[in-house]
Design a protein with these regions (language model features):
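Extracytoplasmic beta-strand/coil segments of soluble accessory domains associated
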Residues: 25-66, 88
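Structural signature of outer-membrane beta-barrel domains
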Residues: 55, 67, 115, 130-132, ...
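Extracytoplasmic loops and strand-loop junctions of Gram-negative outer membrane beta-barrel proteins
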Residues: 72-73, 92-94, 121-124, 159-162, ...
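Short acidic/polar hinge/loop motifs at secondary-structure boundaries
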Residues: 47, 66-94, 113
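Outer-membrane beta-barrel transmembrane strands
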Residues: 271-316
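Short sequence motifs at beta-strands and strand-loop junctions characteristic
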Residues: 40-42, 102, 130-133, 167-171, ...
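N-terminal periplasmic "start-of-domain" segments of outer-membrane beta-barrel proteins
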Residues: 1-17, 47
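Transmembrane beta-barrel wall of Gram-negative outer-membrane proteins
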Residues: 122, 129-160, 165-204, 211-248, ...
Length: 337
């Protein structure tokens, strides 16, 4: 396909090899001028940079529908956990484009495409297991193109795990329904419904490198070992899986955790033995109707009508927090002195 812009298309086959069960941005790490990271290791907490610009300056779309936050431009990939299993291809355009979106796209434009008509007929049931008690079950079925007119595709996902990073657990579902109808040579309609109700523990705070590995810190040229002294100097190292965003809870405590989703004010804690300082919970369903009109060999009109709701939020500290010093063979910040 000829285009005057820097453009890369990641196919379904490439995604299956690169992505596995990671967040969608991780499939683009081999694309020129693209850097993606899973950050602290929380499920869905990935971010992507294009041409040096973070995702606030990258227009991200799913089937032509913009997904950047309307307030700050950020993209919360946990809202689309499981969409990668239904994706047919990802179009990654680097640099400014002619896309008419309110989202600043100086970094580039990313369009995640789930085209039912391009899927072959068949279905699959996939079971994945990994480190950190990770377990993911995926079901997919595609009708293929029926009578050269109609196609339907569905994907259902359930994912759980305690996480490799301490207490970066996940408990998520995902659903996708897509249909396509070719009315005639000039008109095609597509209808989609996507969502991923989920909650997961987060690891968001940066740490001094000595916290993870004193040996590695000592190998870094110019590293000031005294910089680890910020009120208290850790005499032990926590290791790469360290996460300070949680604390132990007395087993006798049976209270629920505050949250807000669809009117519910409280919820059972993920684990009765600990509480996450930073936890994300959200469900952002998306329904859209696309119409593609071919006016001529050189002109096509694309129209998208969509609805996107959502409910959820995240936890965090308010006021002061008591922390215990780092003690060998004891949980970090596990209880107050």
């Amino acid at each position: 396909e000829k285009t005057p812009v820097a453009y890369t298309n990641v196919s379904k086959q490439e995604m299956e090899v690169r992505l596995a069960s990671q967040d969608i941005p991780m499939a683009l790490n081999t694309t020129p001028s693209v850097y993606a990271t899973q950050q602290g290791g929380g499920a869905g907490d990935a971010r992507i940079n294009v041409r040096g610009f973070n995702q606030r300056n990258v227009a991200v779309m799913i089937n032509g529908v913009p997904q950047n936050d309307m307030e700050n431009g950020w993209v919360y990939w946990s809202n689309w956990d499981g969409v990668g299993d239904a994706t047919q291809s990802i179009q990654m355009q680097r640099g400014l484009s002619a896309v008419n979106l309110a989202t600043p796209s100086i970094g580039g434009t990313m369009n995640i495409i789930t085209d039912p008509a391009a899927m072959s007929r068949g279905g699959s049931l996939k079971q994945e297991a990994g480190s950190g008690t990770f377990l993911k079950t995926s079901f997919n079925y595609n009708t293929g193109l029926i009578a050269d007119k109609f196609a339907f595709s569905t994907t259902l996902v359930k994912k759980t795990g305690e996480g490799i990073i301490d207490k970066a657990w996940t408990d998520a579902y995902a659903y996708y329904f897509g249909s396509s109808y070719q009315m005639n040579d000039a008109n095609r309609f597509e209808l989609y419904a996507i969502g991923a109700p989920q909650r997961h523990g987060q690891n968001l705070y940066k740490q001094n490198i000595t916290t993870y590995s004193q040996e590695l810190a000592g190998e870094i040229e110019g590293y000031d070992v005294t910089s680890n002294s910020s009120g208290e100097k850790f005499e032990t190292e926590a290791g790469r899986t360290f996460n300070q965003n949680w604390g132990a809870v007395d087993p006798s405590y049976t209270g629920k955790q505050y949250w807000y989703m669809y009117g519910a004010r409280t919820v059972e804690r993920h684990d009765p033995n600990f509480l996450n300082e930073r936890e994300n919970f959200f469900h952002k369903p998306l329904v859209n109707l696309n119409h593609y009109l071919t006016l001529s060999d050189a002109m096509r009109l694309s129209s998208v009508l969509y609805w996107s709701g959502g409910s959820g939020g995240g936890t965090g500290t308010y006021g002061s927090v008591s922390r215990a010093p780092a003690i060998p063979d004891n949980a970090w910040y596990a209880s107050s002195p």
